[in-house]
Amino acid sequence: MTLVLDHDRAGGYWGATYVFTAVKGLQVIIDGPVGCENLPVTSVLHYTDALPPHELPIVVTGLGEEELGKTGTEAAMKRAWQTLDPELPAVVVTGSISEMIGGGVTPEGTNIKRFLPRTIDEDQWQSADRALTWLWTEFGPKKMPQPRPRKEGEKPVVNIIGPSYGMFNMPSDLAEIRRLVEGIGAEVGVVFPLGCHLADIRKLGTADANVCMYREFGRNLCETLERPYFQAPVGLSSTTKFLRALAAELGLDPEPFIEREKHTTIKPLWDLWRSVTQDFFATANFGIVANDTYARGIRHFLEDDMGLPCAFAYSREAGVKPRNDEVREDIHKSPPLVMFGSYNERMYMAEVGARGKFIPASFPGAAIRRHIGTPFMGYSGATYLVQEVCNALFDALFHILPLGTDMDKGQATLARGADVPVKAGSNGAPTHEVTWDTEAKARLDELVEEQPVLIRISAAKRLRDAAEAAARAKGADTVTKDCLQEALLEGEAV
């Protein structure tokens, strides 16, 4: 058994629930205790998608001791179903407790369909991947439609597969992918599952191509639809390749759109790149820990396209256990100047007092992105990401420069020489000059070397002052490795 530190994803029924509730005309029954709705839906979606309580067509069976130990879940499910619209189809998803007692059995005389999320075995993305295909199997046509020739002047149709609740930055990225598809002259058919009606699911099979929004889930459905599909791009070069490949498949010319984008959407990117922050780009390292879609895309864009050094990059992949112990160790050892990640990474930075700038790029964490002006994907996303990096550098510079009030509180600079009288500091300890032993000096150099280049000078000063203050507090004439360690433990430095 492997103990997972700070879990970064939910179980299977969360993913299935977020997919099913995104479809219009489908009601969802969660077979489990009341918390199985309160946590993933009422609580979490409020902090990630800004959804008010009871916004979605969900009911929970509310299993208690009676059902768990004696009667089973069937009667509770029938009571839950009776509160829904009997004319509309419903699907039941089972939480882990319900799965352990064999729950999810649909009562006779109802129109409830059953989907088994396998929440004990699968994470939210694995289950979401199966849920998308299940919707097509249950509500799509029995036979896959054959591709039909387009009429003269008719636009090719492209579906966007994957947008659903609980996905970081989804509204902005969906808007950008739609803009790109329409920009080259195609038409967006079905956005699935978000906002798609049950009756429109069958239209998925009539498109000329599909775009898979995320690497975590959606590809299984894209394969099932038997149409060419393309991965939604993150970054400059990836977006250009995406547009050209999609256009070639659809028989369109993307170059006029790409040329317009260079003078409009992408123009601020080059202006930002030539701005006053350009002096720091070669040394302003970044780290990223996020879903594979963003971790892979942002690293490729910032490191390969733009030349920023990458301190580390970790992808959260479907079905792969997280390595948060390694993430924590890397952040503690070499904190980057710009950290893209989730609440977990922000917490790890705070543990060591890291002064790098944090940019939300993943869940878990409270980060609402309902507005469509914060894309990571496409050309707009490339410009937005560089803008975020530039602003992070400005913010880092602000914290490097000392405040006037802090300078006023500082102790006077000591004069050198044996005849200078010893003065008492604010804590009563002598403020005489101290020396550094070899081990402490070597450790200081190591700690400073671990810091981003931009903040090394200020980090070295804070660390040196704190260690010397610790030595003086002991009445010592020499800063030892122990003094340095005390300063680190007290959080006075770096």
Swiss-Prot record:
GO molecular function annotations of the record: oxidoreductase activity, acting on iron-sulfur proteins as donors
Keyword Transferase: no
Reaction(s) this enzyme catalyzes, per UniProt: 3-deacetyl-3-vinylbacteriochlorophyllide a + 2 oxidized [2Fe-2S]-[ferredoxin] + ADP + phosphate = chlorophyllide a + 2 reduced [2Fe-2S]-[ferredoxin] + ATP + H2O + H(+); bacteriochlorophyllide a + 2 oxidized [2Fe-2S]-[ferredoxin] + ADP + phosphate = 3-acetyl-3-devinylchlorophyllide a + 2 reduced [2Fe-2S]-[ferredoxin] + ATP + H2O + H(+); 3-deacetyl-3-(1-hydroxyethyl)bacteriochlorophyllide a + 2 oxidized [2Fe-2S]-[ferredoxin] + ADP + phosphate = 3-devinyl-3-(1-hydroxyethyl)chlorophyllide a + 2 reduced [2Fe-2S]-[ferredoxin] + ATP + H2O + H(+)
Signal peptide region: none
Protein EC: 1.3.7.15
Pathway: Porphyrin-containing compound metabolism; bacteriochlorophyll biosynthesis
Keywords linked to the UniProt accession: Bacteriochlorophyll biosynthesis, Chlorophyll biosynthesis, Oxidoreductase, Photosynthesis
Enzyme class: oxidoreductase
GO biological process terms, semicolon-separated: bacteriochlorophyll biosynthetic process; photosynthesis
NCBIfam families: BchZ
Subunit structure: Chlorophyllide reductase is composed of three subunits; BchX, BchY and BchZ. Forms a heterodimer of one BchY and one BchZ subunit.
UniProt similarity note: Belongs to the ChlB/BchB/BchZ family.
Protein name per UniProt: Chlorophyllide reductase subunit Z
